[in-house]
């Protein structure tokens, strides 16, 4: 697997230098699961961040499909900033065999300490995600039932 190519497709790493991407790639562990396997379970503790390298997965909350994850998609971003093992807000289920790059929050935070631009990229992405979620919530509240 070309880890650099996988990371280059991931939104959270946009704008990082090749040297920074190389450091991040070096801190990752590869994880593979079979189709139908739960990668992250809603309500369970989580302290890991993942980037889909190969395959497809879906995000579900209370049985409702919220999103589909293709190569380059990430999940578990909040766990990077909060290492208390907070509960996962949704489940991620492999639709095909999936290979991922994975980091524990501790490993990733050590990388952020070495590469400040990574911390800025993470903060920017999380702010965008919060803004998108807020906009979706506002739209849902305004839509008549």
Where are these regions (language model features)?
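A small-molecule sensor/coupling module
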Residues: 3, 20-23, 80, 86-90, ...
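Absolute protein N-terminus
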Residues: 1-4, 63
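A short hydrophobic beta-strand segment most commonly corresponding to one strand
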Residues: 98-107
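Short proline/glycine- and basic residue-enriched helix-capping loop/turn segments at helix->loop/beta transitions
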Residues: 4, 14-35, 87, 95
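Hydrophobic residues at beta-strand termini and immediately following loops
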Residues: 31-33, 69, 103
